Amino acid sequence: MQSCRTVAVIPARHASTRFPGKPLAIIAGRTMIEHVWRRCQEAQAFDEVWVATDDDRIRAAVEGFGGKAVMTSPACATGTDRVAEVALGRPDIDIWVNVQGDEPLVDPATLQRLAGLFQDASVRMGTLVRPLEADEAASPHVVKAVLALNGDALYFSRSLVPHVREPGTPVQRWGHIGLYGYRREVLLSLAKLAPTPLEDAEKLEQLRALEHGIPIRCAKVTSHTVAVDLPGDVEKVEALMRARGG
């Protein structure tokens, strides 16, 4: 049997409202997009790593450090739409992994875990979860995942789920990490679907898949990614890099 080809795609746009030009922000001497690209390469889980963008400045930067950039439409509303546009023209690629372009500390081992989910032929879509501490689980900014015994997601919510009716009942809550893998046909199908009621209510794009009956397998990891949302986050990430020695 021929093995599946797996590609990581890093969506990157220049026109961020809160942080214009974010992919090109310099962090410890390199652009943020290069940090993410390098960590994808370190994972050794992908046949290729591409950056999907609609901006020539990002394309030039990616090609400057030896990466491959694929130009996509400015009309793409989400990173998933951008990855799907790339996948539309590449029927030879089986597995597509959407890697957030604003997480320069993404752990290569977590990317390996995500790509590895698709060794199971029954997995159509995958993502990652991490164990939550009680103090962070209550925050609506931390998305919780409720899992079935086989690791499939039952639901994702900003609310504190599951609810513990009797105090003292032990429960492990899981936090969602926003990295996704798809089989090509699932990715293309999702990109064509309109937003769903629960997706609109929670503002969580992954609920579109669950509402349409597409199972999402979750790999459990321990590392926690750090996103760069604002210019002030750059210094925080640089401090973490220094603390970790890289």
UniProtKB/Swiss-Prot annotation:
Transmembrane listed as a keyword: no
GO cellular component, one term: cytosol
Matching InterPro entries: Cytidylyl_trans (IPR003329), KdsB (IPR004528), Nucleotide-diphossugar_trans (IPR029044)
UniProt keyword list: Cytoplasm, Lipopolysaccharide biosynthesis, Nucleotidyltransferase, Transferase
Compartments where found: Cytoplasm
Primary localization class, coarse: cytoplasm
Reactions it catalyzes: 3-deoxy-alpha-D-manno-oct-2-ulosonate + CTP = CMP-3-deoxy-beta-D-manno-octulosonate + diphosphate
Annotated GO biological process: CMP-keto-3-deoxy-D-manno-octulosonic acid biosynthetic process; lipopolysaccharide biosynthetic process
Function comment: Activates KDO (a required 8-carbon sugar) for incorporation into bacterial lipopolysaccharide in Gram-negative bacteria.
Protein name: 3-deoxy-manno-octulosonate cytidylyltransferase
The organism of origin for this protein: Myxococcus xanthus (strain DK1622)
Chain's gene name: kdsB
